[in-house]
Amino acid sequence: MNFPRPLVPATLVQRYKRFLFDAILADGTAITGSCPNTGSMRGLTIPGSPIWLSEHDSPTRKYRHMLEIVEADGTLVGINTGLPNRIAEEAIMAGQVGNLHTYGTLRREQRYGRNSRIDILLSDAEKGLAYVEVKNVHFSRVRGLAEFPDSPTQRGAKHLEELGDMVEAGHRAIMLYLIQRGDCSRFRICRELDPVYARAFERASARGVEAYAVKCAVSPGQIVAAGPIVVDEPVPAVL
């Protein structure tokens, strides 16, 4: 996924009200911009952090700048939650997510489950249907290890249950964790921050839901899928 124009470097002053941030541009100009991530962004909102911003000239936008990348401990981390589905699609087509690239048709945002939409629905005359839910991941406390979630997510647990229902209906169901950073070689569920989600993941795994994790190469010019990493989670023997 290439950015349409080069990102603008800046220094983070603060992120607040979930949707906003203040920053200082390289020329010393103080600006306020929009943050396309309503999550906790744990570890990525430290004042003084180097950041990169996209610029938007539309007269209908209240803020010209939008936060895209934060540097954390020397690693560039993508924070825009609107990008993972596009990057995940590229990863699938590049053969980085099992054999999903062999399916004949890919559709986006299809209705399923209990008033939900699946991020990616794959179909094939021989293989049938494969439901792919994509989760954005940027949390890392231990070097080389990516974790999800970084805060409680009831919606995430619901998605796992719905994927399990698809397996029981005779289809494939995949949870794809898209890690918007390149310094991780393993992924696991963060039980300490959301034990409910962890239990939902274990139940879904036992029902046959598959889990994959793909890391990204992040730069101010592009964010691209950089290959699969290990999902460090045992499959439970019982529900």
From Swiss-Prot:
Gene Ontology MF annotations: DNA binding
Gene3D superfamilies associated with the record: 2.40.50.580, 3.40.1350.60
Matches recorded under InterPro entries: SfsA (IPR005224), SfsA_C (IPR040452), SfsA_N (IPR041465)
Domain of life: Bacteria
Family in the record: Belongs to the SfsA family.
Protein name as catalogued: Sugar fermentation stimulation protein homolog
Species of the source: Rhizobium meliloti (strain 1021) (Ensifer meliloti)
Taxonomic placement: Bacteria, Pseudomonadati, Pseudomonadota, Alphaproteobacteria, Hyphomicrobiales
